Amino acid sequence: MTKLVNEMILVLDFGSQYNQLITRRIREFGVYSELHPHTLTAEEIKKMNPKGIILSGGPNSVYDENSFRCDEKIFELDIPVLGICYGMQLMTHYLGGKVEAASQREYGKANIRIEGTPDLFRDLPNEQVVWMSHGDLVVEVPEGFTVDATSHHCPNSAMSKADKKWYGVQFHPEVRHSEYGNDLLKNFVFGVCECEGEWSMENFIEIEMQKIRETVGDKQVLCALSGGVDSSVVAVLIHKAIGDQLTCIFVDHGLLRKGEAEGVMKTFSEGFNMNVIKVDAKDRFLNKLKGVSDPEQKRKIIGNEFIYVFDDEADKLKGIDYLAQGTLYTDIIESGTATAQTIKSHHNVGGLPEDMQFELIEPLNTLFKDEVRALGTELGIPDEIVWRQPFPGPGLGIRVLGEVTEEKLEIVRESDAILREEIANHGLERDIWQYFTVLPDIRSVGVMGDARTYDYTIGIRAVTSIDGMTSDWARIPWDVLEVISTRIVNEVKHINRVVYDITSKPPATIEWE
C-alpha cells in the first residue's frame, strides 16, 4: 500500500455538526486531516502516525452512561492532543479534573481573556471573541494544567499542559464566529505539532489516483455521470487514473435542467474522449414517482432506480465490479453518521439498495464543494463545468414539491433556465454560490389581462456560502429580481406568482426537499 501523506492531523468524531469544519480548516493550511470515529483504539491511531490528535465537540455530557468515549491510552502515545468543547471536557474527565453542568447553557459569541502567553494563543490579542456552544464546563482543571483563558460564564475557557502538549478549549475555533480561531488552529498544527504544510490539490490527485489504481487493479468501473460538478470531477479523475477501464453511464431520468442531457454527451463523449453510454430512462423514473409526494420517499425511489439502471447496464457490459459516485463530505454529514443526527438522506449515501451488485468508489467523500471546484480546475476541466451550479442527484424531482408530473417538471425547467440566464447576464454567477427555482405544491389567485387566474407559484432560492455547511440568502439587486420575475410570469405557462426565499441555513436547508 502506498503511503498517502507524510503528515496528518487526526480528528476524532464525538458528534458535533462542526466536526467536518475542523478537517476543512486544517486542509486549508496545506496539512492533510481526516475525521475518524471516536472508537479508534490507541494502537490503531499509533499505526496511522498522526502529527496531532483533535478531540471534537459533541452533544453528550461526560457523566452520561452512554456518552461517547475514546481510548484513554491516546494520552500515552506522545502525540499532541487538542480537545475542543466536549473534547476538552473528556480530556479533563480522563486526566483527573472536574466537569459539571453549567448553571446556564452558553450558546453564541463570548469574550475571553488570555492568561499569560500560552502556546495556542501565541501572537494573538489578549482579548478576543469566540463561539461557545456548551451545557457543561470544566470547574477544575487536571493536575499540572494551567488555565489559559477565562470568560464571564466560563472561568476555564482554555487549558494546557505544555510539557505533554495537551490542550483544551471550551469554545469552537473551527467556526468563523471565533475571530482568531484559524490562528489558534495554526498555532496547534504548525507550532505544537510542527507540521510543514505540504498537502495540496496536486498532492490529492496523486494520492487518489494511486488509491483508485490499487483498489481497482485491472477491473472495470462504472461512473454515475450527471454532468454536474461532482460527477464530472469524479469521471475525469478516475479516467486519468485508469483510462479505458472506466465506462460512464449517463442516465437521462427526465429530471434534468434545460439542455443538460445534450451538453453532457457533447462535453464528455467528444471533449474528453470518454466512453459514455446514454440511457433514456424518463418513463421508468416518472412511473416510479407517480403518486409519490413525500420528499424522503422520492429520494429513496430515485436513488434505488439509479442503482437498478446501473445494474442493468453492468449486466450488458459484463465484468463491472465498481460504481463511482460524487459523494461529498457535506452529503455524509447531512445524512448522519454514527454520532450525528440525520438531517435528510442524500441520493449518494441514503438510497442505496442492500442487494447492490458492485462496490462503491467515492474519491471526493473527504472534500467540500469549493475544494471539488479547485480539484476540477487542477484537473484541467473547463470553467463552465467547474463552476456549474450544484445539482442534487434526484434532480428536479426534489425541486417539484409534492407529486412529480411532466407539466410540473417543464415549469421548473423553464423557470430555472430563465433564472440562470439572467444571473449570467448581470454578471452575478460567481457571486452567488447556488441559485435555482422550485415549484411548491400550491396555487394562488392572480389576474392576467382581464381574466382571473388560478395557477402555480415559483420560488427562487439563491444563497451565498463557502462550503455548503451554512449559507445566507443572496442579496440579488431588486432590479435583477424584477427582470427575472417578469420573464418567468410572462414566459412560463401556468405561473402567476414569483416569491424569493430569504431564509439562511440553518434553520433551512439549501434545497427545499
UniProtKB/Swiss-Prot annotation:
Gene3D superfamilies reported in the protein's UniProt record: 3.30.300.10, 3.40.50.880, HUPs (3.40.50.620)
Reactions accelerated catalytically: XMP + L-glutamine + ATP + H2O = GMP + L-glutamate + AMP + diphosphate + 2 H(+)
Domain Glutamine amidotransferase type-1: residue ranges: 8-198
Leader sequence segment: none
GO biological process: GMP biosynthetic process
Residue sites binding ATP per the record: 227-233
Pathway info: Purine metabolism; GMP biosynthesis; GMP from XMP (L-Gln route): step 1/1
InterPro entries linked: Class_I_gatase-like (IPR029062), GATASE (IPR017926), GMP_synth_C (IPR001674), GMP_synth_GATase (IPR004739), GMP_synthase (IPR022955), GMPS_ATP_PPase_dom (IPR025777), NAD/GMP_synthase (IPR022310), Rossmann-like_a/b/a_fold (IPR014729)
A single Gene Ontology CC term: cytosol
CDD domains: GATase1_GMP_Synthase, GMP_synthase_C
Keyword flag Calcium: no
Keywords (A to Z) from UniProt: ATP-binding, Glutamine amidotransferase, GMP biosynthesis, Ligase, Nucleotide-binding, Purine biosynthesis
One example GO MF annotation: ATP binding
Principal EC category: ligase
Its EC number(s): 6.3.5.2
Domain GMPS ATP-PPase: 199-388
Residues at the catalytic site: 85 (nucleophile), 172, 174
Protein function: Catalyzes the synthesis of GMP from XMP.
Subunit architecture: Homodimer.
Protein name: GMP synthase [glutamine-hydrolyzing]
Origin species: Bacillus subtilis (strain 168)
Record gene name: guaA
